[in-house]
Amino acid sequence: MDSQMLVALGLSLVGGLSTSLGALFVVLSETPNMKMLGLLQGFASGLMLSISFLDLAHNAINSIGFFKANLWFFGGVIFFACITKFIPEPTLGPSTDGKRRKKNGDEGGKDMMKKHRKQVLYSGLITAIGISLHNFPEGMAVFLGSIKGMRVGVNLALAIALHNIPEGVAVALPIYFATESKWQAFKLATLSGLAEPLGVIIVAYLFPRSLSPEILEGLLGAVGGIMAFLTLHEMLPLAFDYAGQKQAVKAVFFGMACMSASLYFLELSLPETMSL
């Protein structure tokens, strides 16, 4: 392993492990109530939607054209929709929630809380997968930036580190709420960030020449479709259920604004020939 590879790997670790910092904000605070959980789920939904549409899908359109990018994007949507058909998912309608609690009393309330936690855990695991898929190409970007020069690599790694803190929150929050385990929340958030150094290793060793830029951009467009689907199918319903539609929508747009600002400053750190 040459020195350039070691530098890129170290920088990607700095950027990737900042998800752990976001997780610390969650695990060092008290377990949120249901409304707070809904607001934070809405915030995380905004983060995910911005990544999907303003980052991954946008770059795919610019790189391979509108038609091909849309084929990849909706291919990702269909692919993940098919997967969710075969994954057992706890469903819970907000309209029946209160009626069941009144009918069954305390025991019913405990049963409903268990279902809530299962549903939130499912959402958290899907979020962790989506964030990992998003972090993977960021590791590739750090590697390519490091090749360009140390200054570019360092600036890019620091920008990604700031960019990844709210992603750590998005992963750790539902895991902590569902499992009540600080370790599980911290561990999964950290693992999602480790996709970045993994991206460095893979792009350096496995795909130095074989993976064409068009295929890579298409795959990232498909990742955007996957993330958009899981946000609209899994995360937003939870946010509406727990926080109410009006408050959840505000949280969504606040999350979108935060991630958009993060993507903007991240873009400023990239050389002119690169984009995320």
Swiss-Prot record:
Q: Does the keyword Membrane apply?
A: yes
Q: Which residues lie on this side of the membrane: Cytoplasmic?
A: 1-6, 57-63, 145-156, 209-219, 272-276
Bilayer topology term: Multi-pass membrane protein
Q: Which GO terms describe its cellular component?
A: endoplasmic reticulum membrane
Per UniProt, subcellular location reads as: Endoplasmic reticulum membrane
GO biological-process terms attached to the record: zinc ion transport
- Record carries keyword Membrane: yes
Task: Give the signal peptide, or none.
Answer: none
* InterPro entries (alphabetical): ZIP (IPR003689)
Tissue specificity as recorded in UniProt: Expressed in hypocotyls, cotyledons, leaves and anthers.
Q: Which Pfam families match?
A: Zip
- Null phenotype? No visible phenotype under normal growth condition, but hypersensitivity to elevated levels of salt.
List the Lumenal topological domains. Answer: 28-35, 85-123, 178-187, 241-250
Induction or repression: By treatment with high concentrations of salt.
Molecular function in Gene Ontology: metal ion transmembrane transporter activity
Location (main, coarse): endoplasmic reticulum
| Keywords assigned | Endoplasmic reticulum, Ion transport, Membrane, Stress response, Transmembrane, Transmembrane helix, Transport, Zinc, Zinc transport
Q: Where are the transmembrane segments?
A: 7-27, 36-56, 64-84, 124-144, 157-177, 188-208, 220-240, 251-271
Q: State the protein's purpose.
A: Zinc transporter involved response to salt stress. May act through the regulation of zinc levels required to induce the unfolded protein response (UPR) pathway.
Identify its protein family.
Belongs to the ZIP transporter (TC 2.A.5) family. ZupT subfamily.
The protein depicted here goes by the name Zinc transporter ZTP29
> What species is given as this protein's source?
Arabidopsis thaliana (Mouse-ear cress)
Q: Which gene encodes it?
A: ZTP29
